[in-house]
């Protein structure tokens, strides 16, 4: 049976029908949607509008539910109660008697009819639920006892509770229609719109399937239809018989129905052909149109040259004569067209005599051969809109130039004028929307059809799992915004996830090819019911089977180790007791033991699984994943899309699915745990008697908008990747060092080595820029080819930092080939493991992953064959150093005999046991025996081999680490020899990444935490990644789980406090006072000043609920406070004596931007100060604007050491609702982009007129005068600018005046040889320095941590940007001196102890000045004058900003921005952009010459204006 659709009026929902749906949903598929009326749609032809009819129909189609009783008598009783609830119980006058009757009938009954729930109960309960009088009695406990019992009994049931909560219709609770909830942040109303009188239209051309761009248009029109309780006309634009096809009309109607859009009227443009023709003849007779036979190409050229046609001045009679030829369709008539006579000299090309009618002799699908002339869309549209009563015509901004033509036609014909409302077209990356291009994909067989999930058609995206509700929420979030931007599909899918995540049931599926059995002997074969959704009990329960044998993912099994405790989801903790592998090292099965009493799931691996049981066999399933059809995000205008077609965009995986998958229906959306969301494209079919085969369940992956990798099977392996990388990178240094002949490496090898290194840089750069996959793959392929060539020529693997040596080897080297070969093979396995992990992490195609895994397994098998041991990560084969002298060969360098090797392995294994026990924080009773056994094994090893046991990873690194340690202590010049087991050994273990101490495993050291302290990206190479690392590693920012919101850590907040202290002090000197206004703004207040809030409209965040209760009216979270503060000003100002009012507040604001968030620079919540003043005169306000602007400049220049350009914003860029805006602009040379530092606005009287801030002017008694206002603001963006300008490749560089810590004191030279007395004296000296510096107001911190070396501390505080590092050691104390290291230059200064205070103060001031000077020089070299557009474009592309002659016109500025836009990103991850105006500098670089023209070449220049790319 086809799915039913219940439409519900949210203002008056039929609770009884909704309850019926809840009770029959197990038998019948019924979808519920919101609309303007209550009805049940059974098919296109059958619709029920009467509630009782709906109830009876639902009950009769779901016979097993028993809602309509079990016999004729019960049917009759139910009919009685249906009538009773609709009449007596709904009447105020008869309510008392009706309740008495109901109470009597329920005195001995649980249900009204029979012994089970029926329609009678649903209907009567729903009526009482919506009855205010009954609800009042219930609250006052005045209800009749049996009715109350019965009502409460039903209300407690899940279905009643669910419906009653979601569709609360109690009159004492105001509801908000859910459509309004979708309008989050979009309150732009239609001009002139009146409730109930709005008519909108959706006019598609019947020439193809609707795509997502059409869906936006349709849903926007529906939004205004519903919001204004108006009318939506669905009109087919069939003005072109060549394109119009009847088949597509049916297709489009189906697409509209899929979107749950219900038009009030269906029309065709062809319905009005006669009327349109009469209007055309009217224009001819009035001399406003003429017939032209100019060939098309010539006409196009004339329009471009603004040349009039030879027929433009024809007489009316001549035009009518030619018009008749057109109507006949004669050969001459076919060469003609009817043109409007408007203005051939217009700057708007659409006004240069556009075509109104053309001659086409093809038959029309609806009118046949009746007409030979057909109107153009541009002529027919305004006429039909007027005739059909359209009040508001919604059109995309690409039609903007045609709006003038639209209104000309309306005025020329003297007909009613609709209002055009513009919105932005939906542009999506990696997508083509052209019907011609989409048809090519279908014809080429690259897709399955027009409903292919890769297609942007309505049916395509719905088939891929997009929900109509998700699409509506996305469209509503965009609203009627006019900003034209290219959006990622991720945005849409993220909205969709919000809809499906709370309701999608959770199931399990395992990759069939890689499942591994797990034997759990003590498990019982049984079934339990668990929640389908862990957070939503309404989704219901599902059966989960348990058995002694279960299956898990092979990728998960690879991550396990024996003895590990693993959490099996929906079962509990299980211990892995044994891992069985085949000869190739592949895991074949696992043995496990239940540990269900252990409920600690915090540190365990969580995996999915399926039981082997005959009661519930796994269901075969195919998971299909789709990629973009187009590989390039944005295609250029002239680019051929066929060059960027992704020929491998569909991938399938065969899965073993949850037995519950057999019940899925087509279109059901589920989540496969740890894999993602899927939609059922084809339900499972059991074995067919015809084919003797079962049909698998086909599931299509639904993207969910995430950009970070999801946790998947084997995800634990990713956590191992990092240590493995370190092992492989350090491994070459531990292997045998071949003896090198005196001659240098050959020139050819060196050249090849350099080519490999250069190509490696190319690959890294492409990945950093997130280049197209095919570009990266090509570069990687070339890199691998070069590496293979290098190995062939040199006989060695390419290793970064290890250039080729000569091939000559001594005889002693050749005598030991096996150790080197083993090590080389070990390194190959490690590298191939990295390849496999990377492919899995990137979700590469299955074929690629399989090929890489097979290669890995063959390498492991080869390694085992050669060494006789399994490959173990972190345990490379023992190696011997190749020495030229025979004497050196005799020295033992590791285990040599079979017995020694076996003992070596036992020590290593026992070391692992000890480390694991300590990592798991096992009890001392367990750890001590393990350590004792380890020590005994080490003693045995020493007695057998004569040498101490040393882990392989520590070999050969002592010399290097000794140098490293000496370097760390160089301020003390500590060059004493150190014992083997002292510092160097310990550092060695860190550097190798193995977590082992130099003395072996388990000797009191335990596993050491590995940290990647320094920056791994360079500012000049990958600015975005560098910035991200700086703010996190320097402890400025902590990321938060709400996108666009960040935690300001003390290190960054202290900078804001410094700015706040300075600025607060200065504004108070001016007479400004601090205050605080609420964060919440009413909708009415926010909408008062349209021009002001228009820019903020898309960014406003709304509060719509309190708990689960919808608010009567949504409340905005302030994007700015003008509309909050100024009504209060109006109350406080009564006369001129109440002025001026000068208030400031330090607070947070929320602007829910859709752009890519960037900490400090573009965030959804940020801190700021906002000042708002009101004055009696214009001049007073103007003075304050400049005073505040100068304070902002001082914040940047005196505190942050950043030079700024002071100036005034252009008309386009000024503050919405203000008279003019002044600004300070900073420049970031690393990106070649400017950034707005702070603004100070003169608001004139705009807001005072809106909010009635008036006073009586003493000069003109009796007259009211509006106040003059200004506002000004500075945000935490300042911190981001400071980081970008001063930071370097070592981290932050903090200007001393805002640094949280200006000097950090670090003790050096603490070694084992240092006595306790000297150590304490050194600590005391450090604290003494701290006390002395605090005494002269220097912010200082002493780092006395004993678990970090001095070198580590140096790096740490350099990364955090501390201006000065003070190093002091025992020798410094004896010499009464210390070493000061400057962060800005790295310069080291030796300073006498007695001069500490004075010298450090001087250094700090010098650092502040140096930073400012350096940044000023940077700005000076990057800000130039350009007098032509060509020169300006070159300047922009070289990463500079320029002052150009400019006319100040908004259209001109838009043109400059469009002209200077470029295809390539300004920086990785940043959107492409054109230049925008930054400010009109108060002090330009040069004076404007008289007669100078704007760079556009059209208008005289008014001033030099600073333009550039900007954040």
UniProtKB/Swiss-Prot annotation:
Keywords tagged on the record: Acetylation, Aminoacyl-tRNA synthetase, ATP-binding, Cytoplasm, Ligase, Magnesium, Membrane, Metal-binding, Methylation, Multifunctional enzyme, Nucleotide-binding, Phosphoprotein, Protein biosynthesis, RNA-binding, Translation regulation, Zinc
Q: Which amino acid positions bind L-proline, per UniProt? A: 1120-1122, 1151, 1241
Q: Name one GO molecular function term.
A: glutamate-tRNA ligase activity
The segments labelled Proline--tRNA ligase in the record are 1006-1511
User: In the record, which positions carry Phosphothreonine?
Assistant: 355, 897
Q: Which residues carry this modification: N6-acetyllysine?
A: 300, 417, 498, 535, 542, 637, 787, 860, 1502
EC no. given is 6.1.1.17, 6.1.1.15
GO cellular component terms attached to this protein's record: aminoacyl-tRNA synthetase multienzyme complex; cytosol; GAIT complex; plasma membrane; ribonucleoprotein complex
**Gene Ontology biological process terms, A to Z:** cellular response to insulin stimulus; cellular response to type II interferon; glutamyl-tRNA aminoacylation; negative regulation of translation; prolyl-tRNA aminoacylation; regulation of long-chain fatty acid import into cell
> Per UniProt, where does Zn(2+) bind?
1447, 1452, 1494, 1496
What modifications does the entry list under PTM / processing? Phosphorylated at Ser-998 by RPS6KB1; triggers EPRS1 release from the aminoacyl-tRNA synthetase multienzyme complex. In monocytes, the IFN-gamma-induced phosphorylation at Ser-998 releases EPRS1 from the aminoacyl-tRNA synthetase multienzyme complex, allowing its association with the GAIT complex. Phosphorylation at Ser-998 is specifically required for the RPL13A-mediated interaction of the GAIT complex with eIF4G. Phosphorylation at Ser-998 by RPS6KB1, is also induced by insulin through activation of the mTORC1 signaling pathway and promotes the interaction of EPRS1 with SLC27A1.
Q: Which residues bind Mg(2+)?
A: 1236
Residues with the modification N6-malonyllysine, per the entry, are 300
Reactions mediated catalytically: tRNA(Glu) + L-glutamate + ATP = L-glutamyl-tRNA(Glu) + AMP + diphosphate; tRNA(Pro) + L-proline + ATP = L-prolyl-tRNA(Pro) + AMP + diphosphate
Query: What ranges does the record list as Basic and acidic residues composition bias?
Result: 299-315, 708-728, 957-975
Stored Gene3D superfamilies: 1.20.1050.130, Anticodon-binding domain (3.40.50.800), Bira Bifunctional Protein, Domain 2 (3.30.930.10), C-terminal domain of ProRS (3.30.110.30), HUPs (3.40.50.620), Ribosomal Protein L25, Chain P (2.40.240.10), S15/NS1, RNA-binding (1.10.287.10)
Protein purpose: Multifunctional protein which primarily functions within the aminoacyl-tRNA synthetase multienzyme complex, also known as multisynthetase complex. Within the complex it catalyzes the attachment of both L-glutamate and L-proline to their cognate tRNAs in a two-step reaction where the amino acid is first activated by ATP to form a covalent intermediate with AMP. Subsequently, the activated amino acid is transferred to the acceptor end of the cognate tRNA to form L-glutamyl-tRNA(Glu) and L-prolyl-tRNA(Pro).
Q: What is known of its domains?
A: The WHEP-TRS domains are involved in RNA binding.
Query: What protein name is recorded for this chain?
Result: Bifunctional glutamate/proline--tRNA ligase
Read off the lineage from the record: Eukaryota, Metazoa, Chordata, Craniata, Vertebrata
Q: Which gene encodes it?
A: EPRS1
């Amino acid at each position: 049976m086809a799915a039913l659709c219940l439409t519900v009026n949210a203002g008056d929902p039929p609770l009884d029908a909704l309850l019926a749906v809840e009770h029959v949903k197990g038998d019948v598929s019924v979808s519920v949607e919101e609309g303007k009326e209550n009805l049940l749609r059974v098919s296109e032809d059958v619709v029920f509008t009467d509630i009782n009819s709906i109830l009876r129909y639902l009950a009769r189609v779901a016979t097993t539910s028993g809602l309509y009783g079990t016999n004729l008598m019960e049917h009759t009783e139910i009919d009685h109660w249906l009538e009773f609830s609709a009449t007596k119980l709904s009447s105020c006058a008869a309510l008392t008697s009706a309740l008495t009757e109901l109470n009597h009938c329920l005195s001995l009954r649980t249900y009204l009819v029979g012994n089970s729930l029926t329609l009678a109960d649903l209907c009567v309960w729903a009526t009482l639920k919506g009855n205010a009088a009954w609800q009042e009695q219930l609250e006052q406990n005045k209800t009749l006892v049996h009715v109350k019992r019965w009502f409460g009994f039903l209300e407690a049931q899940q279905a009643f509770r669910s419906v009653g909560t979601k569709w609360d219709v109690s009159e004492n609770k105001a509801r908000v229609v859910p459509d309004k909830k979708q309008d989050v942040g979009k309150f732009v109303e239609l001009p002139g719109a009146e409730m109930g009188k709005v008519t909108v239209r959706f006019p598609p051309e019947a020439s193809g399937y609707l795509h997502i761009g059409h869906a936006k248009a349709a849903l926007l029109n529906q939004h205004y239809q519903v919001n204004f309780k108006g009318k939506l006309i669905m009109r087919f634009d069939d003005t072109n018989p060549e394109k119009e096809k009847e088949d597509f009309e049916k297709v489009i109607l189906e697409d509209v129905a899929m979107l749950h859009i219900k038009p009030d009227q269906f029309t065709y443009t062809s319905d009005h052909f006669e009327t349109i023709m009469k209007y055309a003849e009217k224009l001819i007779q009035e001399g406003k149109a003429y017939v032209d036979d100019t060939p098309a190409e010539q006409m196009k050229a004339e329009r471009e040259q603004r040349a009039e046609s030879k027929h433009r001045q024809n007489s009316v009679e001549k035009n009518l004569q030619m018009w008749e030829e057109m109507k006949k369709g004669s050969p001459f008539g076919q060469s003609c067209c009817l043109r409007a006579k408007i203005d051939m000299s217009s700057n708007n090309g659409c006004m240069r005599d556009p075509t109104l009618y053309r001659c086409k002799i093809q038959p029309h699908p609806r009118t046949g051969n009746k007409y030979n002339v057909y109107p153009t869309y541009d002529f027919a549209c305004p006429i039909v809109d007027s005739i059909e009563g359209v009040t508001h015509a919604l059109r995309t901004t690409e039609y903007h130039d045609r709006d003038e033509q639209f209104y000309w036609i309306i005025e020329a014909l003297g007909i009613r004028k609709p209002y055009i409302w513009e919105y932005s077209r939906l542009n999506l990356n990696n997508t083509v929307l052209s019907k011609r291009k989409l048809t090519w994909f279908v014809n080429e067989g690259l897709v399955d059809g027009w409903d292919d999930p890769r297609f942007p058609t309505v049916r395509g995206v719905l088939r891929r799992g997009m929900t109509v509700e998700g699409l509506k929420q996305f469209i509503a979030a965009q609203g009627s915004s006019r900003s034209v931007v290219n959006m990622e599909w991720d945005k849409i899918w993220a909205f969709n996830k919000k809809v499906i995540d709370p309701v999608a049931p959770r199931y399990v599926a395992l990759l069939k090819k890689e499942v591994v059995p797990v034997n759990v002997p003590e498990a019982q074969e049984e079934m339990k019911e668990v929640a389908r959704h862990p957070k939503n009990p309404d989704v219901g329960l599902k059966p989960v089977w348990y058995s002694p044998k279960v299956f898990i993912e092979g990728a998960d099994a690879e991550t396990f180790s024996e003895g590990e405790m693993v959490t099996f989801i929906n079962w509990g903790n299980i211990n892995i007791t044994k891992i069985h592998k085949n000869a190739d090292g592949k895991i074949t099965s696992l043995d496990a033991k239940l540990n269900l009493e252990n409920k600690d799931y915090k540190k365990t691996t969580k995996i999915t699984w399926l039981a082997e049981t005959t009661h519930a066999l796994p269901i075969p399933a195919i998971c299909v994943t789709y990629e973009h059809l187009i590989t390039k995000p944005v295609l250029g205008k002239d680019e051929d899309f066929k060059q960027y077609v992704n020929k491998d965009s569909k991938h399938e995986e065969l899965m073993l699915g949850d037995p519950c998958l057999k019940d899925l229906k087509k279109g059901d959306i589920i989540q496969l745990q740890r894999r993602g969301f899927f939609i059922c494209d084809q339900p499972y079919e059991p074995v067919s008697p015809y084919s003797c085969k079962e049909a698998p369940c086909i599931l299509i992956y639904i993207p969910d908008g995430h950009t970070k990798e999801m946790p998947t099977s084997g995800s634990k392996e990713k956590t191992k990747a990092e240590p493995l990388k370190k092992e492989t990178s350090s491994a070459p240094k531990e292997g045998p060092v071949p003896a090198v002949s005196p001659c240098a490496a050959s020139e050819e090898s060196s050249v090849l080595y350099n080519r490999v290194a250069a190509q490696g840089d190319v690959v890294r750069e492409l990945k950093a820029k997130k280049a197209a996959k095919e570009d990266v793959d090509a570069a990687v392929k070339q890199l691998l080819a070069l590496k293979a060539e290098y190995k062939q020529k040199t006989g060695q693997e390419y290793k970064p930092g290890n250039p080729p040596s000569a091939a000559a080897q001594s005889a002693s080297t050749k005598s030991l080939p096996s150790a080197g070969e083993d090590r080389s093979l070990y390194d190959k396995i490690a590298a191939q493991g990295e390849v496999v992990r990377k492919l899995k992490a990137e979700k590469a195609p299955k074929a690629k992953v399989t090929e890489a895994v097979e290669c890995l397994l063959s390498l492991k098998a080869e390694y085992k064959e050669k060494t006789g041991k399994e490959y173990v990560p972190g345990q490379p084969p023992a190696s011997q150093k190749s020495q030229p002298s025979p004497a050196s060969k005799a020295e033992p360098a590791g285990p040599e005999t079979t017995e020694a090797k076996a003992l070596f392995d036992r020590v290593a294994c026992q070391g692992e046991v000890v480390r694991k026990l300590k990592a798991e924080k096992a009890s001392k009773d367990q750890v001590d025996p393990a350590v004792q056994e380890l020590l005994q094994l080490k003693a045995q090893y020493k007695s057998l081999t004569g040498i101490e046991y040393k882990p392989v990873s520590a070999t050969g690194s002592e010399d290097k680490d000794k140098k490293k340690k000496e370097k760390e202590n160089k301020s003390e010049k500590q060059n004493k020899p150190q014992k083997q087991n002292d510092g160097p050994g310990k550092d060695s273990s860190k550097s190798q990444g193995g977590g082992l101490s130099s003395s072996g495993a388990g000797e009191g050291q335990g596993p050491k935490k590995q940290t990647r302290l320094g920056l791994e990206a360079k500012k000049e190479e990958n600015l975005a990644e560098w910035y991200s690392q700086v703010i996190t590693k320097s402890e400025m920012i902590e990321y938060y789980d709400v996108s666009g919101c960040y935690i300001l850590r003390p290190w960054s907040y202290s900078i804001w406090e410094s700015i706040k202290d300075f600025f607060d002090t200065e504004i108070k000197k001016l007479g400004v006072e601090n205050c605080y206004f609420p964060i919440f703004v009413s909708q009415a207040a926010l909408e008062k000043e349209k021009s002001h809030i228009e820019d903020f409209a898309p960014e406003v965040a709304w509060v719509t609920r309190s708990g689960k209760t919808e608010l009567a009216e949504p409340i905005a979270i302030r994007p700015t406070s003008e509309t909050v503060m100024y009504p209060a000003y109006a109350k406080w100002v009564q006369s001129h004596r109440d002025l001026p009012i000068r208030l400031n507040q330090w607070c947070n604001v929320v602007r829910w931007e859709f752009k890519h968030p960037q900490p400090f620079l573009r965030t959804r919540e940020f801190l700021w100060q906002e000042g708002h003043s009101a004055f009696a005169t214009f001049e007073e306000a103007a003075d304050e604007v400049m005073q505040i602007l100068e304070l902002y400049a001082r914040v940047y220049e005196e505190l942050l050491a950043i030079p700024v350009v002071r100036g005034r914003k252009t008309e386009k860029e000024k503050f919405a609702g203000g008279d003019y805006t002044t600004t300070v602009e900073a420049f970031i040379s690393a990106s070649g982009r400017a950034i707005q530092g702070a603004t100070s606005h003169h608001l004139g009287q705009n807001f005072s007129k809106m909010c009635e801030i008036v006073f009586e002017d003493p000069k003109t008694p009796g007259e009211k005068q509006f106040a003059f206002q200004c506002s000004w603001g500075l945000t935490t963006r300042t911190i981001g600018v400071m980081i970008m300008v001063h930071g370097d490749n070592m981290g932050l560089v903090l200007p001393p005046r805002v640094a949280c810590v200006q000097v950090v004191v670090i003790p050096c030279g603490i070694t084992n040889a240092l006595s306790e007395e000297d150590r304490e004296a050194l600590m005391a000296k450090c604290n003494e320095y701290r006390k002395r510096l605090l005494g002269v107001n220097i912010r200082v911190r002493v780092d006395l941590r004993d678990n970090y070396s001095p070198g580590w501390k140096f790096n740490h505080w350099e990364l955090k940007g501390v201006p000065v590092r003070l190093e002091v050691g025992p020798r410094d104390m004896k010499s009464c001196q210390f070493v000061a290291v400057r962060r800005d230059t790295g310069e080291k200064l030796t300073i006498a102890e007695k001069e500490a205070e004075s010298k450090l103060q001087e250094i700090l001031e010098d650092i502040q000045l140096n930073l400012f000077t350096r940044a000023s020089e940077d700005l000076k070299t990057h800000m130039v004058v350009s007098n032509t557009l060509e020169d300006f474009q070159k300047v922009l592309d070289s990463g500079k900003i320029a002052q150009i002659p400019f006319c100040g016109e908004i259209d001109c500025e838009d043109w400059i921005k469009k002209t200077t836009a470029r295809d390539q990103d300004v920086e990785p991850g940043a959107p492409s952009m054109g230049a925008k105006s930054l400010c009109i500098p108060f002090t330009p670089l040069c004076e404007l010459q008289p007669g100078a023209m704007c760079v556009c070449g059209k208008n005289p220049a008014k001033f030099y204006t600073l333009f550039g790319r900007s954040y």
